[in-house]
Amino acid sequence: MAAPQDVHVRICNQEIVKFDLEVKALIQDIRDCSGPLSALTELNTKVKEKFQQLRHRIQDLEQLAKEQDKESEKQLLLQEVENHKKQMLSNQASWRKANLTCKIAIDNLEKAELLQGGDLLRQRKTTKESLAQTSSTITESLMGISRMMAQQVQQSEEAMQSLVTSSRTILDANEEFKSMSGTIQLGRKLITKYNRRELTDKLLIFLALALFLATVLYIVKKRLFPFL
């Protein structure tokens, strides 16, 4: 059965290896980082935490090495501690290089964005001028349409006024026709009445004339032929 001290040594070594791999992975992430600067800052914060954990575990392993009873095991563990320290220093150097590479990449990207931003500003200026010209053209077109619609409205009003006048004229003519129709009907009645009266007058004249002739004949008869 392994001694408790050996178990602690094994666990400590495993954690040192784990933190070392995590540091290497974060350093690679920094190499691949193209910005922004806040992303780089976040990665560096994680690297610092892992380095601190790694340093503590190396110190724990060194303390365990010093507590070994056998000199050979002590020296072996101290050699491992030294190797871990060298590896940590190598990781720190790689970390600095990765930061330098990342910062250069970010600077280049920012310069490219500035240049592109100038192009974008020129494009925006051109676009604004084009939009202003288009807006002016659209405004003129709308004003032309508005004038045309106003003319059409005026023509419609004039046509409506003409229709109203024509309708009024027709109504007046209709009233005149009605008045004339009444006058014609009245004239017809008067003519009919006059015709009837004329016939009656003729009949009365004829009767009076007949009566007069009869009277004359009677008088003549009495005078000329008294014996009859």
Swiss-Prot record:
GO CC annotations, alphabetized: COPI-coated vesicle; cytoplasm; endoplasmic reticulum; endoplasmic reticulum membrane; intracellular membrane-bounded organelle; mitochondrial membrane; mitochondrial outer membrane; nuclear envelope
Subcellular location: Endoplasmic reticulum membrane; Mitochondrion membrane
Top-level taxonomic group: Eukaryota
One GO term of the biological process aspect: response to activity
The keyword Manganese is assigned to this record: no
Keyword entries, A-Z: Apoptosis, Coiled coil, Endoplasmic reticulum, ER-Golgi transport, Host-virus interaction, Membrane, Mitochondrion, Transmembrane, Transmembrane helix, Transport, Ubl conjugation
Transmembrane segments: 200-220
One function term, GO molecular function aspect: calcium-induced calcium release activity
Classification via InterPro entries: Sec20 (IPR005606), Sec20_C (IPR056173)
PTM section of the record: Polyubiquitinated. 'Lys-63'-linked polyubiquitination by RNF185 increases the interaction with the autophagy receptor SQSTM1. Undergoes 'Lys-29'- and 'Lys-63'-linked polyubiquitination by RNF186 that may regulate BNIP1 localization to the mitochondrion.
Family from the record: Belongs to the SEC20 family.
Name of the protein this chain belongs to: Vesicle transport protein SEC20
